Regions:
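Class I S-adenosyl-L-methionine-dependent methyltransferase catalytic core
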Residues: 1-150
Length: 150
């Protein structure tokens, strides 16, 4: 599902549910949403500005940041993880992985298979104090997530 701007690509709801099933978690907060693309019970809009607040600690946070603000959300995720937040983020795969220091800060899952028509590849980063750091591959076939390599 696309909103009016490519900055606001909505994550397909069935993909969100599969992430919850796969990681055995339940998202409570969407940290970068709008009234048309929110995916969980509580969400924060651009006007709420989640970049300027402490994120909730009482549930898992989902983050699909606007493409134009990726670089602002990376340090925010690290800051909030260090506070104790449990976060799963989705990032577009790009040629420059040096811009995404999450390789050292989170458990990264490379997603094989298209989620949106416009985006060829994405990775999930699970920011959690108890998560083992590393990289694994997952396959998305429009119905479920499965391991394809670890």
């Amino acid at each position: 599902m696309m909103s009016k701007s490519n900055q606001d690509i909505a994550t397909p709801m069935n993909f969100i549910r599969e992430i919850e099933i796969f990681f055995k978690i339940k998202f409570k907060y969407d940290m970068a949403a709008n009234h048309d693309n929110n995916r969980v019970e509580y969400y924060f809009t651009e006007q709420d500005n989640s970049l300027e607040m402490d994120w909730p600690l009482d549930g898992w946070c989902w983050l699909n940041p606007p493409f134009g603000k990726l670089s602002q959300f990376i340090p925010k995720c690290k800051e909030q993880k260090d506070r104790g937040c449990r976060i799963v983020t989705i990032w577009p795969l790009s040629g420059d992985f040096n811009q995404i220091p999450t390789w050292k800060e989170s458990f990264v899952s490379i997603i094989h298979g298209r989620i949106w028509p416009e985006v060829r590849g994405v990775m999930l980063c699970q920011w959690d104090l108890d998560t083992i750091k590393g990289v694994r591959g997952l396959r998305w076939d429009k119905k479920q997530l499965t391991y394809c390599w670890e």
